[in-house]
Amino acid sequence: MINNWVSSSKELQLLVDDYLLTVNYRSVIENDLVNYTQGIESYFRNERLTLRDKINKFIEELPESYRELLSEHVGNTDDWIGKLVSTRVFLTHGDRENMAVSNPYKLVQMTKIFGFMVRIFILQKLGITIDKPKILNKFKNVLTTH
């Protein structure tokens, strides 16, 4: 793992930095969502893609079992990505027409699920695998904490 970290790309290090901002410092959930999306944007910064396409690519790079877990809990992944992007646009630019998720509970759930997937992505890039029962347990904890 240490070798993987030392040899990791600058983009992965930027993603990890944004992820750690959310887990090491208390902030409002809206900032967490912005930090996660900023991390994904940084990771794919050398690719000419929209934020929506970057998040889609990020999800496509997750192992299939995690993509399935995501779709089990959010329904249509494409719609979920659209809500995620629209909410981030609102939080960043204040355009209320783009606020896709205004319900605080749903915003917390969406952000926690997104953060969980970012964590899995980072661990995968560092070569760390976690057994499925342990992941399912951690995911349940994410869904039940506020």
Predicted regions, residues:
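Amphipathic, oligomerization/interface secondary-structure segments
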Residues: 1-146
